[in-house]
Amino acid sequence: MSEKKFDIYFEFNYSKINLAVFNKINDKLEYYKEQTYESYFNNYKELNFEKLEKILEESILEIEKSTKEFVRDIYLIIETPQSKSLKLSVTKNNEGNKVIKEDATYLVQDAKQQILKTNQDLGILHIIVENYVLDEIQHKFLPLNQKCIKLSIDVEFICFPKNLIKNFEKLFSKQQIFIKRFICLNYIKTLDYIDKEQNICEQGKSIVKGINKQEVVSIPRESKRKGFFERLFHFFK
């Protein structure tokens, strides 16, 4: 199978679907389309997946015609009132040792497992480390090699209901398309430093590229089978 030349982004919001195609080599926007439609029932509480399926099929054909390349995977940006922001602080006794990456990795993993255990109906889209706290002193970024007795982190988790995630996965699987990553539109809107002149798909690409240095970046599930610890090293390195 030949190497893909393009990254595809879809964005579903309350009134439109936006499509964008980016050149993988230079990140240039090669194709962009906005389409107005009504995707929700019941005052934005329930998605009309039957209507989405028809629009999606037409959109995929347009993209493949434009790029002369089959669409096999995409990045998906979604606006939904069902998104949730959960926050948690976790602590460890660092015994006066220097802070290393593994300490932060352990705490993030601990926080993640607690969130998943108590919210089994949710899937995590974004993990943001808001603060690292060393002996009651806050830091926005990991202060490596500083000594402390007490180390804690404040973490925010942006989540979608698992059934919503599964419904979108099912929708795209009918076109034999894998969703590489879900991105929450409400989360994008909270970032003051993101380029407001860009369209939503471009802003979503900035998220994927790591514009928020406090966000833990994970590897797509279908490739690079690495454990959670190893995946977090991509963030803490």
What are these regions (language model features)?
Residues 16-19:
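Short N-terminal binding/cap micro-motifs at the start of the first secondary-structure element
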Residues 1-14, 24-30, 35-70, 78-237:
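Nucleotide/phosphate-binding catalytic cleft detector across ATP-hydrolyzing
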